[in-house]
Amino acid sequence: MGVEFLVGRSGSGKTRLIIDSIQDELRREPFGKPIIFLVPDQMTFLMEYELAKTPDIGGMIRAQVFSFSRLAWRVLQHTGGMNRPFVTTTGVQMLLRKLIEEHKHEFKVYQKASDKTGFTEQVERMLTEFKRYCIEPEDVRRMAESGTASEYRGERMLSEKLHDLGILYQQMERSLAGHYLHSEDYLTLLAQQIPLADVVKGAHVYVDGFYQFTPQELRVLEQLIMHAEHVTFSLTADSPSAEQAPDELDLFRMTGSTYYKLYQTAKELNADISCKELHGTKRHQHAPELACIESQYDVRPAAAYTGGQEAFTVMQAQNRRAELEGIAREIQSLVRDGGYRYKDMAILIRQPEDYKDLLKEVFADYGLPYFIDGKASMQHHPLIEFIRSSLDVVKGNWRYEAVFRCAKTELLFPLDQPEQKIREQVDQLENYCIAYGIKGERWTSGERFVYRRFVSLDEDFAQTDQEIEMEHMLNETKEWMAAPLVKLQNRMKKAKTVQSMAEALYLFLEDTDVPLKLDRKRQRAEEAGNMIEAQQHGQAWDAVIQLLEEFAGMMGEDEISLALFQQMLETGTESLHFSLIPPALDQVFVGNMDLSRMYGTSCTFVIGANDGVLPARPDENGVLSDDDREWLKAVGVELSSAGRERLLDEHFLIYMALSSPSDRLYVSYPIADAEGKTLLPSIVVNRLGELFPDHQEKLSAADPEQVSEEEQLQYLVNKQVAQTYTASQLRLWTREYEISDVWWSAYNVLMKEPDHRRAKKLFSSLFFRNEAKRLERPVSRQLYGEHIKGSVSRMEAFNACQFSHFASHGLQLKERQFFKLDAPDIGQLFHSSLKLISDRLREQKLEWRDLTKDQCRNFSYEAVERLAPKLQKEILLSSNRHFYVKEKLQKIVTRVSGILSEHAKASGFVPVGLELGFGGSGPLPPLTFTLKNGCTMELVGRIDRVDKAESSKGLLLRIVDYKSSDRGLDLAEVYYGLALQMLTYLDLSITHSEDWLGMKATPAGVLYFHIHDPMIQASLPMGLDEIEQEIFKKFKMKGLLLGDREAISLMDTTLEEGRSNIVNAGLKKDGSLRSDSAAVSEQDFHLLTDHVRRTFEQAGEAITDGLVSITPYKLKDKTPCTYCAFQSVCQFDESLKENEYRSLKAEKDGTILDWLKKEADDDANS
């Protein structure tokens, strides 16, 4: 047996020498003794391709490329040892999750931590590390029980940690014993079986690409040395370390220590040892700058390089996106102008999570093919989400979030239905479930979902044909969605063991045709040329089946709860990863600096070279701290490197990255993160600055205007990117900035392209103004018709903002409805409750003033009970919380009823109409208009309450409007058309009083009654009567009254002097009205109602003429945008010139009346 060491610095030709040696042997003896080429997992595909592409060999029978795991699989297949299946990392984590739950009561340290996310994974890593370093459960127990007399202050804590780990390690080994092999046991088994393996006997073994080995791997190598004919080890180091391991500060500490261990092993085995040192750098013979970096990077002091620097570039960028875009442009330039292929490029990242998603986005924009080395998590694959959400449904009372998470994976969809149609139906059902609060038994009881678009608390309507059709579709969708999940739920309820639960889940996947659906997704991905996605669909299904098989195999007869089953399955799916091979040869390689292995790379981009990233700070999130590891190492327990050693090894990884390309090296770093926080350059950048003092950093500018005109041409790499940058430059021009002529040329070229639709659309946005153009007459008529039938509130909405009215009444956009109790719902309940009470009084021939407190309470409770099932999809009956809300509402209605009764006792006014309709079947006719443009308009609605009183001047009428918020009548709002309801109601009542009531009436006022349950604050204790009196004052009605003493006295018969507690008016000693009374003359009322009618006409004409401008009003601090549902549609933005509020001047009531009088005089004189 012979052992040869190939030792040389990076780029010295070690791998090339091995490949050439293998190729020579294959040419010389194609069917000779086996050749084993042992490399890391990440390097197997690359080396297989390198050997296979040799044109004169034509295939390989003799030579094979292996990783340790593939070699184990091959040896054990031929020698035995495969009778017990291996358990994957996923299976181990699921088993550990179960063991943690069973034994957490025995833990000394990890009782609380065991419930945290990621704990199971950390434990699995630690136990795997024990196995790799040949530490048995008994060793862990012995370490935990060792004395605590050392100077290490954390030894007691370490002892307790090891105690807990020892329990789990021992229990895991017991669970697997005789049935399964841990995924790390394959190396131990491989070392045992190598003496029996024909593939090893007499073989030539080449080992390349490794920096260090675990004790398990060293045992395998020891057996290879003993049983192979010859073993060649290739290690990156500047010199052999045969007799002594290198100093810990040596750049090649890691590989030097590996050399020392291998040399001592070979020496103990009496192998024939030889060493071949490779000097110089073959890789960098045409790039002296790179040769300088390779040779001088770790030399201090190093001679500054003064030659040409074309092969080396440091790039600075504003942020990570600008950094990647700069690299993408550079790659395009190298391919286009430098004669390189994409496969000649490599991007190395120290922290891939910072760049991975952004890189996919940027490279897609630039049309760059790429392959990201490494295993991507399966967490976001539809199948994994389908399983997780399905179990959430059956365990979590069918919450709508879980149900629709499941549905939106599209794996629940019927196989034979058009997907787009099904998506729309699922969206509609989701909207229904959100609006109706569907959950739990509502899905499983068999009761049909009832759909009603139009519901009234006061009247019952028959279902429309449209409602019936929608209800049918909703129930059909519900049936096919719920049926398989109900079946899964029933099976899970019956299942008691892990085996039966795993079977139930598998049958669910089969029932829903998941294999066929995934295969269809795979075929579509292949047809679209997305080979990586195609691989993922197949791997996801295989991984899930293997997971269930391991689950059932290891713990099949164990009885567990559904909650623990779900928890273990969640743990298992979290550890699932895709293992992908490059789907094409000509791709940019994107790798992790510490794990990836490269060969034949011409241009390397080392990105993200920031402080704290390169070199990387050691991760201390493991189960054992760095101090724990250092102490264990001091007492002779070998584990993986502690943080201090890993930090030292970072410099070797950096060295390997910097020396990896043969032609060009780019080192880049951003100066800020996505949030604008400053990022500092790495010490690597500073070191390169020392080696190349004359080097000028290149700026990867996010915007072209930051670089010279010549450099701006580099931003025109392809049509899509050119369109984006051209649009951004022309946008600067629209803001009166100077731009290069390059962009006008680019604009002309792009607009002349045969397919220039995207460019045209993009460039048209440059001249976009956030304005809504007036609708053409045919469009306006089609939307609104020749006859408008609307409400007063609709006219108020139009006057508040024309566009908001257009969105709601023209486009008929609606907000998504939610199952919640909003202020309008409560207001509707109050209105309807008071109407029901009034109806009961009329039936029993009672007056409000006749009511006792008990009657108020009984009538109020009865009214709310009758209305609750009709309110907002029965929300008041849906939960204990809402039942409590219902009781609160009953108390408020009771309070209000009592106050109304007290008001009636002190008033000469009596209700003459409640919920009085005008238009339609109401007793009053609608308010009608013939507009100047030929259209007609009809306003309909309902008046809360009309009161009448007999006075010496005849019949008086007043309007009372119930509001759940405190408000009065602001004449400025009336003037601007924002508060038209009350005066419209008064106008209609007075105008038609003779037909309706048999005599002409005079306006007495308009009042708002605030429905609420007030709280009284007092600095001193108060008696019950005092409290009631204060509460009574809180219900004073606000509004506008007729400035007549008799009318005021009729509203409050108790008022003789001072302020009224019922209305916002008062009397002086002489009987005249106080100056602070909200009162006007009868003539003023007519002025106001005439103005309201003119406002309606103007609004109606504007609507039918197609006015839809985005001009919301602003009156003091009030604006309709505050509660507008359509802000995302109009995109109103004060920073834009064209978007300004329509500022309305706030004036006192007297000023408003003066304006109206002047306008009336002007009209009379015109």
Swiss-Prot record:
| E.C. code | 3.1.-.-
The alphabetized list of GO BP terms reads: double-strand break repair via homologous recombination
According to its UniProt record, this protein's enzyme class is hydrolase
Cofactor (UniProt): Mg(2+); [4Fe-4S] cluster
Q: Which GO terms describe its molecular function?
A: 4 iron, 4 sulfur cluster binding; 5'-3' exonuclease activity; ATP binding; double-stranded DNA binding; helicase activity; metal ion binding
Top-rank lineage group of the source organism = Bacteria
Q: Which UniProt keywords apply?
A: 4Fe-4S, ATP-binding, DNA damage, DNA repair, DNA-binding, Exonuclease, Helicase, Hydrolase, Iron, Iron-sulfur, Metal-binding, Nuclease, Nucleotide-binding
User: Where [4Fe-4S] cluster is bound, by residue?
Assistant: C801, C1121, C1124, C1130
Q: Taking every annotated instance into account, which residue ranges of this chain make up the domain UvrD-like helicase C-terminal?
A: 281-586
Q: Please give the SUPFAM superfamilies that the UniProt record associates with this protein.
A: P-loop containing nucleoside triphosphate hydrolases
Extract the Pfam families matched here: ADDB_N, PDDEXK_1
Where along the chain is ATP bound?
A: G8, R9, S10, G11, S12, G13, K14, T15
Q: What does the Swiss-Prot or TrEMBL cofactor note state?
A: Binds 1 [4Fe-4S] cluster.
- Miscellaneous notes for this chain? Despite having conserved helicase domains, this subunit does not have helicase activity.
In which family does this protein belong, per the annotation? Belongs to the helicase family. AddB/RexB type 1 subfamily.
Q: How does it assemble?
A: Heterodimer of AddA and AddB.
Protein name according to UniProt: ATP-dependent helicase/deoxyribonuclease subunit B
Tell me the organism.
Bacillus velezensis (strain DSM 23117 / BGSC 10A6 / LMG 26770 / FZB42) (Bacillus amyloliquefaciens subsp. plantarum)
Q: Which gene encodes it?
A: addB
